[in-house]
Regions:
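PLP-dependent class I/II
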Residues: 1-163
Length: 163
């Protein structure tokens, strides 16, 4: 049985509905039957691979975090803007663009829709990628797209300095 929790949530308005109770019972039963956690380990490995694929594609460095759940990855564009180009470039970004510009442009260029992290109590200029539901190749496209966007903004900034 496959059930998308978002679809289940859309099917009711409040409280635990029968589909949710059934789904939770099936998940709990499956967890009890899989004593060696084979499925769980396989899914954790898949998420881990997607996380590293995303970050390797950006060219940015993924810092170790023992508390990382791995379901989402947040990339703070201002951190990487500062690291690669300095504080003046960060100020240029803040003055000339909005935090949502990056995710809109990413959607236009890659046809992949991500959310900015500001709505999830993350840094305003961060991009939030779910690691749970896309193919490995999609994370390559996302990572390369994020890096390309940052570098194209830097190119515009450098051109503005020459004027």
């Amino acid at each position: 049985m496959v059930a998308d929790s978002r679809q289940v949530a859309l099917s009711h308005t409040a409280g635990l509905s029968l589909p949710q109770q059934t789904q939770m019972s099936l998940f709990a039963s499956f967890a009890l039957l899989d004593a060696e956690n084979t499925y769980k380990k396989r899914m954790q490995d898949m998420i881990h691979e997607r996380l590293h694929t995303l970050w390797e594609s950006t060219g940015f460095t993924l810092l170790d975090d023992p508390l990382r759940a791995g379901y989402y990855s947040e990339i703070d564009m201002l951190v990487w803007a500062k690291k690669f180009y300095g504080d003046d470039f960060v100020e240029y970004l803040k003055k000339n663009y909005e935090p949502l510009d990056v995710v809109f442009r990413l959607a236009q260029e890659t046809s992949l829709v991500l959310l900015n992290g500001g709505g999830f109590d993350a840094p305003e200029w961060s991009i939030r990628a779910s690691l749970a539901n896309l193919k490995r190749e999609d994370y390559v496209r996302i990572g390369e797209g994020i890096a390309s966007i940052l570098h194209s903004y830097a190119q515009r900034w450098k051109e503005s300095l020459d004027k």
